[in-house]
Amino acid sequence: IEEPVGNNVFSYDERTNKKIFVPKLIKGTLDDVSLGENIVFNEIDEDTEIKAIGLKNLVQYEIDGKVVYIFDNHNHAFYFWMKSLQEGLFNKGCRLIHVDQHKDMRKPDDYTVDLDNLDDVFRYTNKVLNVGNFIQPALKKGVFCDVDIIDSSYGFDLKPEGEYVLDIDLDIFSKDMDYIPYDFRLNKIKELIKGAKVITIASSPY
């Protein structure tokens, strides 16, 4: 992506690097999840240009009959939700459980996307959405009826009922979240995985 759209809009005019990379999707296992060589997120933070390297590939794999998607920038979750919906992996209108240090609930400028056309979903995901606004369009389009956000110790008390898709940002394990014991976070997420229809996991490299 070379134009100032999607995740490439952040600090675009001030940056020396003007393009970010979207890795391809492969089917594989956890062994295929590895760091690539390309910049996938780039912004200026406190006068320092951050050039975050993403994954070599985005990975789809199955474990215990569940489909799991692993990717870098969190807005890719929107594409994988639509792909999974088209494949009948979950029912439209179920709940979303979002485990993340951040709420990611900002509103995009545009909600125009054909959910039945994955090429258009790809365009929308990468050229309209960014890492902070990908949940609202899924709610507005009725893909999910509601979202439960787990971003605190209180949030981990959630005991979901009914069908849900689980969305995880690995920044839930960042140092800023260390006020919640690591094993507690890990075990709660393991419990949520057991009941999920589909699981999306963002590495969030920035």
Where in this protein do the model-derived segments appear?
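Conserved alpha-helical scaffold segments that buttress catalytic/binding sites
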Residues: 1-206
